Structure formats: structure tokens, C-alpha cells
Amino acid sequence: MKKLFILCAALVAFGLNAQTKTISKTELRNKIKGGWAGQTIGVTFGGPMEFRYNGTMINRYQPIPWFDGYLKKTMLENPGLYDDLYMDLTFVEVFEREGLKAPLASHAKAYAQAGYALWHANQAGRYNILNGMMPPASGHWKNNPHADCIDYQIECDFAGLMSPGMPNAASEISEQIGHIMNYGDGYYGGVYLGAAYTLAFVSNDINYIVSEALKTIPKQSKYYQCISDVIRWHKQYPTDWRQTWLQVQNKWADDIGCPDGVFAPFNIDATVNSAYVVIGLLYGQGDFGKTVEIATRCGQDADCNPSSAAGILGTMLGYDRIPAYWKLGLKEAEDIDFKYTSTSLNDVYEIGYQHALKNILAHGGQVTADAVVIPSAAPKAVAFEESFAGVYPTEKIGINKDLMNEYRFAFEGKGFVVRADMAKWASTDPHAFEVDVYVDGKVFEQVKLPVNFTTRRHELTWNYDLPMGPHEVRLVLKNPNPNYTCKLMDAIIYRDQPLLKTNDKFYRLTD
């Protein structure tokens, strides 16, 4: 009986230990610092390459600058580069003001009303919020053609860094904030990388981190399948990241959502850019320099991707183990507030640490004098959702005309997106064009198109829900302004099936 009691006690103790992870407060601080510093280093390094190499790797002979003083110089002279950071910090500042249970509306309004320029899903979400559409509707693909873009992926870091060792806690944050501007695969990018950050606190195995984090993503999603492929291709080509890049390009590089990426080499889709982050992590194998360079040389969003990779690796290594070469000039940049915020790196090192302590306690962990006890739980998949289900881009109609009074076009399909340009960079003029949109002779919507760059509407109009068949769209400008033009660029047409065969309008070479 005595032996049985001892055995049972040992099993209970083992079970409790298996469900927690203890790390020192010193290590926790060091890892949080490493995560924020890593992001900053990565985005600064990749900045000159951002969207200069689309659909191609960056040439081997292409030099990328890095020198002492470069971090401070870039932060002061090109503050808009750091959208990865200032978007994160917007949400961090809300948590700091209102606590970890800050309402979603506070996060949505804080970023929508901020003074910084935004693009893609972030800007579309901002426009929706400023015009009365709150999350999660603001990020849904039928209200936001950029729903699958990279946006929440590049700003999810805070969710992981305040949830050390707790991937499901990070997912809880992402489920709320990620839907402000994204949906489907765009949302999954932030869930996945947020989970990777959390696991970097409790594991030094990059292979484990990227595989275990994937358990937060539904298996039937395109995002899961792509990242799973990257992990498999890494095993198949363990020493040649370019082979894996080619496999990604061949299988996953067709963007069907983002209007700027459909029928174009440009790709800001979260799935492909997450693949590049994972390529950097897997082939970097814990080497900071290799990781940021490979993630950058994959191209496309070549500043955000090394930022994510370096942030995750910086968390795993901790600040002190980031090589000195990559911290050249970092100290002199750590007290500079990121533009549009009141927060510097030194500030967020401490704020992030305090938020992590509070989040550990909120999820049943413990904080002692010199350590934290983190509750461990297996990552759980978030709910399945899919953007652009049942619609396929089949044609781009070039327009390239100023909308003077009205313009109309006809097409056969079930949906369309009209791209237009009406805002001027840095404009703060309150004027907004007013356009009535008619579909098949009936008013579909009346849109306001600000010329103010910060509050602009990314696309003029879109509709993915028409019955399959012939349609006509008519655009009527109600208030022309001699100081501004509303430039119609093109219309992307969607059908209920992809165009796979030659017809009376297009030739299609089948595989």
C-alpha cells in the first residue's frame, strides 16, 4: 500500500509538472526584449527590399545594407517603414490604458483614428470603422477585399509576446483583434505567428515551434496546407531553401483576393508571406543572420517577413543572445518613440513584461518573487473560415480614365471589384467624392471617396454576390472637384468557376 501511495503521488506530481512550465523572471524579460528588438532589426534590414522583388527571389549578388547607426537613421528618416511596430503598439497602448479586458471597440477606434498611413486590409478596415462598420464585419471579405492580406500577421506579435507559453491565450486575443481587419487566411497568419511567439518562450527547437504552432490552424484551410507543405519540403530539401521557395511559388502564389495582386506578380497574401517567414526560420536553424537574410531574399513583403522571423527567433534566443553585429546601434534607437505612438522600445520592453505577468495570472499561472509558472495546454485550432469561397477571378478590364460624370462597363460573371485612385499622398483635405453605383440599373450603393490619404477608401466598389450571368455597372460622380481627379484603373471580374478552357474570348493553355 505504501509503495502504491508513493507511486500515485509521483504520478500526480509528474502530471502537474507536465502541465506547467517555470521560467525565471530574468529569462522572461530577456525573451520579451528579444522579441521586440528582433522585429525592429528584421524590418529595418528588409526595408530597402520591400516589394521590389515580386514573384522572384532577391538575386544572390544584391547587397542589403547593414551598418552601425543604420537603425537610428532609419527610424528617424523613414518612420513609416515601421507599420509592423506602430500597429502593434497601438493595441499595446490600449491594453495599458484600459487593462487586458479592454473592449474590442477601443482597439478598433484607436487604430482607425490614428494618424499613420495604412494599406490593404488595415486601411480597408479603418475606412469601414470610420464609416460605422465595426468588427468583425470590418474585416470580413465581403466588406474588405483585402481580408486575406498580410495585415494582422505583421501586427500579431504583441499577442504572442504577452502570452508566453500559452498559444491558446494568444489565439483568444487574435480572435478579437485579428478580425478588425482580416478574415480567413489573413486572420490565420496572425493566429499562427502569434502561437509561434508563445512557443518560442518554452522551446529552443525551431522545427518544433513551427510545427506545434500550426495546430492552432484548421487543417482544411489553404493556410494550413501551405505551411504544412513548407515543413514537408524543408525535409525533402533540407539544405536548399530556394527549392522550397520554387515549390511555394508553383503551388501557392496565385492571389485571388487582393485587387492589387490578382493577375499580377505582386502578392501580399498572408499565406505566401507566412511561408516565407517559415522558410527563413527552418533554413536559418537558429542562426539570426541566416534567418533574416533568407526571409528577406524570398521577396514580396520583404521587410515584414524578416521582422516576423527575427521577432520569433529573438524571443527564442533572448535579447542577450542576439549577435552583437545585429544589435549595432540598437541602444541609441531604443529610446526613440515609434512615430504616431508615445512608446519606444525601452518602454515596450517593460510594458510588455508587465502585460505578460498579468496574462499569465489571468490564465491560471503563478508569479513568484523570481519566476513565473506558466500553465501549459496543447494548441487548439481556431474556427474554420474561408474568404472568397466560390468566386474566381477570370478577367481584368482595363479602364484608365478619369471619372468625369459617369462610366459604365458590362461583363459576364458573378462579381466585380473596381480599382480607383482618388487620394493624394499626405493630403488632409476634407473633400470626399460621392459616387452612386448602379448594378443592372438599380442603385447598389452610394460611396464616399475621401481624397485624404489617411481616411481613403482602397477600392471604389465591389460585389461578390451577383447571380452568375451578364451584368452592367454604372458609376455616377455626383460632385466633381477641379482640384482632384477620381482615376478609374480597372475592374476585376469574378465567376463561379475558374477559366480553365479556351472560349470565344480567351485562349487557355491547359496543363
Task: Annotate the PLM regions.
Residues 70-90, 334-361:
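A structural-propensity feature for long, helix-poor, extended segments
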Residues 45, 52, 56-64, 185, ...:
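Catalytic phosphate/nucleotide-handling subdomain of diverse soluble enzymes
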Residues 48-79, 85-88, 104-119:
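Active-site-surrounding "flap" and adjacent substrate/cofactor-binding loops of secreted or lumenal enzymes
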Residues 23, 129, 138-147, 158-166, ...:
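Accessory "access/gating" subregions that flank catalytic or transport cores
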Residues 99-151, 161:
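Extracytoplasmic mature domains of secreted/periplasmic and thylakoid-lumen proteins
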Residues 422-498:
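Beta-strand-rich ligand-recognition modules
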Residues 368-413, 417-429, 497-511:
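Glycan-recognition and processing domains
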